[in-house]
Amino acid sequence: MKAQISRRRFLATTATTAAALAVPRVLTAQKSEKQLVIGEGEHRYEVLHDWPQLPDKYRWQTTHNVAVDREGLLYVIHEGRENQKDHPSIFVFDGEGKFVRAFGNQFQGGGHGLEVRTEGKEQFLYVTGYQQLKNFAKLTLKGEPVWEKHAPMDSGVYPKDEDTKPTKRWGRDAFMPTNYAFLPDGGFFLADGYGSYRIHRYDKAGNWKSMFGEPGKGDGQFNTPHGVWIDNRPGREASVVVADRANKRLQWFTLEGKHIKTLDGFILPANIDSHKDVLLVPDLSARITLLGKDDKVITHLGEDPEWREQVLKDGMKLRGSRNGEGWVAGKFLHPHDACFDPAGNIYVAEWVHTGRITKLRKVA
């Protein structure tokens, strides 16, 4: 999560846009003796907060992103504390939520983006680091490094030494990568969501090729392009969709970076994933949006304006709760990322100090 978003700006952005997207109806959790269920119709989910459990020797340190491999293993990255270099930043769990392994100490203090990609018969992790790290890397699923790269100086966007002497410096000429989208040709897009507000394009070897976008509010311009995804849902030509977070919208582009359309009315859309016809958009302001094949809202999971007020109260005090005091079952605080697994279940990573990973088990 971007350290420089002020509390005042966060509160103002959220308060003025919470009602902008048409909401089918406010959803409340349905609780029985065995299940806590949210959603409606064909999109109902059992809520399993704190589903994966860490061994006692580890602690969540502000969870950021989640990804699932083809075997059903869940990968979680947290930001981590810069002064705890011996603590891993990436954690792996099996389909029952049991701990499998951990690695990635090198991302402590700046762990952010995380995606799994299949390349031929192999799978790899793609990771981004922000803050003082300012890097992005390709790893095996066991955490072995394949390559690591820094600011693309060929872009002409960044000052001297941004790639060789990274520091915790913010600004539109800084390199602060957030998330990936994988291209059909083996290349990928990399969103510089906290830095230059550009979307960089790389080839399959990780060589910089081009970029699109710039800071601003117009079509093709961004204000915190935090998430990026290849939208190849059935019946449509593949495009790249960007979660333009502080502009409160999604923007679609051709794979060459030409603007196609804009969908306004979100609060703080943080990232994107898809499953069949559904687009999944975790929103940093206490809800998760599902869009249908026509890009119209199916539902906002966890939507509750009164709860949102509580989440934002006293400078987002609930975010810092050390034991979950004040948190409500079936509600979210700050969904920073979410992803589907092949069965249509959803995993949610929240931007809270103690970290929280929730499994939404699909029941309909």
Residue ranges and their predicted role:
Residues 30-364:
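Eukaryotic scaffold repeat domains enriched in small/polar residues
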Residues 1-17:
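N-terminal secretory signal peptides and thylakoid transit peptides that target proteins
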